[in-house]
């Protein structure tokens, strides 16, 4: 693993960049305050823009740490307005692996944008940051997230039945993964 931190990434339609404190209102409006947008993530809606500001302030501070990876997802045509985020949510240095998590404003679902962002981050983590393995997981009640992972080139690795307490219920979750060697195979 090579600790390179969160650097900006451009794709066909997106700019993935570090969060700025000025992103708080857009994040709050676009997804952090919307319960309908948060059905399948581990955290609850932010009660106020202040909660969002505090989260972003922590992230901005963490950008000093070169093993902190968290990108604001923006449309290239509007790089000052965040529509989602994607980040490394867990790391296992012993096996040179990490897990990614992501969220996208519901207003942008079904357009291929999350797949585009995930593909770019997988390349960054496997080639540039030199992780050997990247995984992602989702509650099986959200099969669209599994399709995003598959379209981004990740392979299905298994389902853990009744393995996570999520939003007041015990649920199943599935895991997808990719190795550096998978990326090299194309």
Where are these regions (language model features)?
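Hydrophobic residues in alpha-helical segments
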Residues: 31, 41, 63-64
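Conserved GNAT-fold acetyl-CoA-binding loop/helix
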Residues: 37-58
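Short, surface-exposed helix-loop/turn micro-motifs enriched in polar/charged residues
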Residues: 43-44, 65, 96
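A short hydrophobic/aromatic micro-motif that marks alpha-helical segments and, especially, helix-coil
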Residues: 48-50, 63, 168, 183-184
